[in-house]
Amino acid sequence: VKSANNSRFNELQQAESYEQWSSNYAIQIQCYMAALNLSRTLVVVYNKNDSGLYTEIIDIREGVLDKMKQKARQIILARTPPKSPYSSTDYRIKKFMSAKEQAVYNLEQLPDNVNCRNCKHSEPIIEGDGGWRCNKFNKPIDEAKQRAGCEQHIWLSSLVNLPIESQGDDSITYMKGPNSFTNAPKDQLGRTSYTSHEMKELSKVNYDPEVVKKLMRFRDEFGVNTRLEELTRK
């Protein structure tokens, strides 16, 4: 059973086909039928404006569920996010995302949370009950540790919207104009190397050289990863 406003309900009646009306709903109902071992099902759509009903019997299409499972597997294991089907000005982006969420979604800023799931060393486990694994320390990671992250964190390069100059097991070097920025763990920092927390703050100002100088002063005086909230404060 689905509900729809009058406009969408009229579109369904004109299409005369539930699966032609919505490709998302079509995939959904096919997966439901396959999972429940049904060969056909009755779908009912309720008009929220005038209580009208649309009914249709839908037959199963073999292979849809397996195809969607394979697609889900590819997405889960991907090292880069799928290409967005929406432009940065699409109403779904503007209406349903905060300014911060839009900036992260459009790769203009790094996410606020530095954690295992956005670290290059981690990967999902899809066997058994699932989970996450750290390849740096060669062990599974429970949820609490995933959320906390660690000082060996290196951003997934797909989240850093800069050209890659070079990368190693424990660092990635990016270019911003003539300047290089190496994302490295806390114990491997140099004058052009930055922790993931520092990279996050620098991304808010598009890696402004003046803010980089300020960061270096803070680091020299107070230590790594201290007073970062002051870097971009206006």
Where are these predicted regions, by residue range?
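Metal-dependent nuclease catalytic regions and adjoining charged, substrate-binding loops involved
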Residues: 12-13, 17-24, 31, 35-233
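Active-site ExK catalytic segment of metal-dependent nucleases
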Residues: 1-14
